[in-house]
Amino acid sequence: MAPRLGIFLLWAGVSVFLPLDPVNGDQHLPGRFLTPAITSDDKCVFPFIYKGNLYFDCTLHDSTYYWCSVTTYYMKRWRYCRSTDYARCALPFIFRGKEYDSCIKEGSVFSKYWCPVTPNYDQDRAWRYC
């Protein structure tokens, strides 16, 4: 009885951790057993459109890890984001009709420095904290 139980436990353990299906960028990735990996050397394209939404930065939409499209219109070509991929401040920029050349606190609910990721915040309203 003990050898059979040992073989069963070994089989059950291997079955849990064995990847059974290939994964591509069009699927929702279960984050429990996967770690982020770069899928290609292509660069992120910002802004990009995914499922009708415009993204100016890496996103968690339909994923456990931040990712980006490598085409302007998402066509199942994507990769996980690296630290160098996230949106950068667009300096100088326009906010409430005035031009700025550095991060500002003006307009911040939490009094934190921020900047837009496009040259005209008034038009695009895409921003990030500095």
UniProtKB/Swiss-Prot annotation:
Expression across tissues is:
Component of seminal plasma.
| Primary site of residence | secreted
Which residues, by range, are in coiled-coil regions?
none
Q: Report whether tRNA processing shows up as a keyword of the record.
A: no
Q: Which InterPro entries match?
A: FN_type2_dom (IPR000562), FN_type2_sf (IPR036943), Kringle-like (IPR013806), Seminal_plasma_PDC-109-like (IPR016356), SP_Capacitation_Regulator (IPR051666)
As for subcellular location, the record says: Secreted
Which GO BP terms sit in this record? Answer: single fertilization; sperm capacitation
What keywords are annotated for this sequence in UniProt? Disulfide bond, Fertilization, Repeat, Secreted, Signal
Q: Which residues form the Fibronectin type-II domain?
A: 39-83, 84-130
**Could you name the domain of life of the organism this protein comes from?**
Eukaryota
Please name every pair of cysteines joined by a disulfide bond in this record.
44-68, 58-81, 89-115, 103-130
**A single Gene Ontology CC term:** extracellular space
**Signal peptide bounds:** 1-25
Pfam families to which the protein is assigned, alphabetical: fn2 (PF00040)
Q: What does this protein do?
A: May form a complex with spermadhesin AQN-1 which possesses phosphorylcholine-binding activity.
Family, per entry: Belongs to the seminal plasma protein family.
Which protein are we looking at? Answer: Seminal plasma protein pB1
Taxonomic source organism = Sus scrofa (Pig)
